[in-house]
Amino acid sequence: MLLMIDNYDSFTYNLVQYFGELKAEVKVVRNDELSVEQIEALAPERIVLSPGPCTPNEAGVSLAVIERFAGKLPLLGVCLGHQSIGQAFGGEVVRARQVMHGKTSPIHHKDLGVFAGLANPLTVTRYHSLVVKRESLPECLEVTAWTQHADGSLDEIMGVRHKTLNVEGVQFHPESILTEQGHELLANFLRQQGGVRGEGN
């Protein structure tokens, strides 16, 4: 079972629909509905942290879920969930250089993890005013996707993953109709097994 932590966001059920189309069994709980211990008792196979309107500090149980389950099962954070992953491992979440609400951007990626086999660059849809500050990214996380300036230098972080654990975040919305290959990205996450990355993950 895939457990979706709903950070009170209207996009959550679009994500649920996409995962359902990929034949995943999904259970949704609000971020203030269950404790970490109650979530553990549900014995999920994987957890997704949804988008939301706040910062990681107001995202209910999200940070505690990352701390408890990282290394035990696959975790994926989307938008706020991605920022929560960055913060949980020691990164800083700051205001983005440019607020993006319903705008598409081409992003570049390393063809790793959830980005494996996807178009590069990939057109994605962004709804966010916050980002993980790239200068603050902890040693244990690597940038897997980014936007670029005209000169090719890195602009904003669009994806991260833990270097040894099955923990990944994407700043954009794979469940948006305007995002290319959103189903394929989520299908890549569903293929991940266990908490520690091994061959084929």
Curated annotation (Swiss-Prot):
| Superkingdom of this protein's organism | Bacteria
Associated pathway: Amino-acid biosynthesis; L-tryptophan biosynthesis; L-tryptophan from chorismate: step 1/5
- What InterPro entries would the database entry show? Anth_synth/Amidotransfase, Class_I_gatase-like, GATASE, TrpG/PapA_dom
Short name of any one Pfam family annotated for the protein: GATase
Spell out the protein name for this chain.
Answer: Anthranilate synthase component 2
Q: Specify the Glutamine amidotransferase type-1 domain's residue ranges.
A: 1-199
Q: Where does L-glutamine bind?
A: 52-54, 83, 129-130
What induces its synthesis? Expression decreases as cell grow from early to late log phase and further decreases in stationary phase; there is about 5-fold less mRNA in stationary than early log phase.
Q: Which UniProt keywords apply?
A: Amino-acid biosynthesis, Aromatic amino acid biosynthesis, Glutamine amidotransferase, Lyase, Tryptophan biosynthesis
Cross-referenced PROSITE patterns, in alphabetical order? GATASE_TYPE_1
Reactions the enzyme catalyzes: chorismate + L-glutamine = anthranilate + pyruvate + L-glutamate + H(+)
The record's statement on gene disruption is: Cells lacking this gene fail to grow on low-ammonia medium but grew on high-ammonium medium.
Q: What is its EC number?
A: 4.1.3.27
Q: Which Gene3D superfamilies match?
A: 3.40.50.880
Q: How does it assemble?
A: Heterotetramer consisting of two non-identical subunits: a beta subunit (TrpG) and a large alpha subunit (TrpE).
Function, in words: Part of a heterotetrameric complex that catalyzes the two-step biosynthesis of anthranilate, an intermediate in the biosynthesis of L-tryptophan. In the first step, the glutamine-binding beta subunit (TrpG) of anthranilate synthase (AS) provides the glutamine amidotransferase activity which generates ammonia as a substrate that, along with chorismate, is used in the second step, catalyzed by the large alpha subunit of AS (TrpE) to produce anthranilate. In the absence of TrpG, TrpE can synthesize anthranilate directly from chorismate and high concentrations of ammonia.
Q: GO biological process: what's one of them? A: L-tryptophan biosynthetic process
List the active site. 79 (nucleophile), 173 (for gatase activity), 175 (for gatase activity)
A molecular function (GO) term: 4-amino-4-deoxychorismate synthase activity
